[in-house]
UniProtKB/Swiss-Prot annotation:
Disulfide bonds: none annotated. One of its GO terms (molecular function) is structural constituent of ribosome. NCBIfam families: rpsS_bact. It comes from Lotus japonicus. GO terms for cellular component: chloroplast; mitochondrial small ribosomal subunit. One of its GO terms (biological process) is ribosomal small subunit assembly. Keywords: Chloroplast, Plastid, Ribonucleoprotein, Ribosomal protein, RNA-binding, rRNA-binding. It is found in: Plastid, Chloroplast. SUPFAM superfamilies: Ribosomal protein S19. The keyword rRNA-binding applies. Protein S19 forms a complex with S13 that binds strongly to the 16S ribosomal RNA. Belongs to the universal ribosomal protein uS19 family. This is Small ribosomal subunit protein uS19c.
Length: 92
């Protein structure tokens, strides 16, 4: 279920503070965050945000097409390597 339009999008306070500080200084640096549930807002466009996937931080460059999505959508947590091969010779 999607979030109600009467509510504002969720962005972690610490992440929002970092974005606003960089925007006022007009600097670009990698922002490290564990907040995968934060919604991407227009103030984040042009920044590189390193999102935690459970093991490491993946740097993601935010573009205008990502606005409205969650940060966690862009850093996959699972690494599917394929199903096990069916080796009939080893069974005999």
């Amino acid at each position: 279920m999607t979030r109600s339009l009467t509510k504002n999008p969720f962005v972690a306070n610490r992440l929002l503070r970092k974005i606003n500080n960089l925007n006022t200084k007009s600097e670009k640096e990698i922002i490290i965050t564990w907040s995968r549930t934060s919604t991407i807002i227009p103030a984040m466009i042009g920044h590189t945000i390193a999102i935690h996937n459970g093991k490491e931080h993946l740097p993601i460059y935010v573009t205008d097409r990502m606005v409205g999505h969650k940060l966690g959508e862009f850093s996959p947590t699972l690494n599917f390597r394929g199903h096990a091969k069916n080796d009939n010779r080893s069974r005999r």
